[in-house]
């Protein structure tokens, strides 16, 4: 497996599928299959998109290598966001200047997010997260969408 997670070569295909109007679920499933066929040993992939729906705050697409794709709707909560979200890597990325986060899970040391302990217990060895804004594909070269050296999305 490559030591660095370079997904830039997949960005153009991802954007092209989006421009073809393929449903998001099909795009996510195809992306995950492409990545694993290219040699990345991905076991789980999650993409969440915030919504403007009055009852649903977000829509998640969760792909697991052994199970395929599932979708989840996250209801808006009168009390605000869930405790799990507040303790998640994505919450951290959305509320700091960071754009990427990567953690080795096989090092045996403590982890800084509860989800990472769950993933470690499931046998996963690496975790990577990346914020991508909708405007990036239109404003920049699509091959740069997954560049870990990029600055925070606009």
Which role fits each region the language model picked out?
Residues 66-128:
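Regulatory sensory and allosteric helical modules in signal-transduction proteins
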Residues 126-154:
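Sensory-domain boundary capping and coupling elements
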Residues 29-33, 117, 134:
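A broad, structural surface signal
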Residues 57-61, 73, 139-141:
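Short, conserved acidic/polar surface loops in the N-terminal third of protein domains
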Residues 46-53, 105-109, 130-137:
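Short, glycine/charge-rich beta-strand/loop segments that flank catalytic centers
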Residues 1-21, 26:
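Signal-transmission linkers at sensory-effector interfaces
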Residues 20-68:
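Helix-loop-beta substructure at the N-terminus of cytosolic sensory domains
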């Amino acid at each position: 497996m490559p030591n660095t997670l370079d997904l830039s070569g997949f960005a153009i295909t991802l954007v092209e599928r989006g421009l073809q109007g393929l449903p998001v679920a099909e795009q996510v499933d195809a992306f995950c299959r492409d990545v694993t066929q290219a040699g990345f040993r991905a076991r789980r992939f999650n993409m969440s998109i915030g919504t403007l729906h009055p009852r649903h705050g977000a829509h998640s697409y969760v792909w697991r290598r052994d199970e395929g794709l599932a979708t989840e709707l996250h209801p808006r909560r009168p009390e605000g966001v869930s405790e799990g979200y507040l303790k998640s890597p994505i919450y951290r990325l959305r509320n700091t200047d960071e754009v990427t986060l990567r953690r080795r899970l096989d090092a045996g040391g403590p982890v800084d997010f509860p989800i990472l302990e769950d993933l470690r217990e499931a046998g996963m060895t690496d975790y990577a997260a990346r914020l991508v804004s909708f405007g990036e594909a239109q404003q920049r070269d699509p091959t740069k969408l997954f560049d870990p050296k990029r600055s925070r999305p606009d």
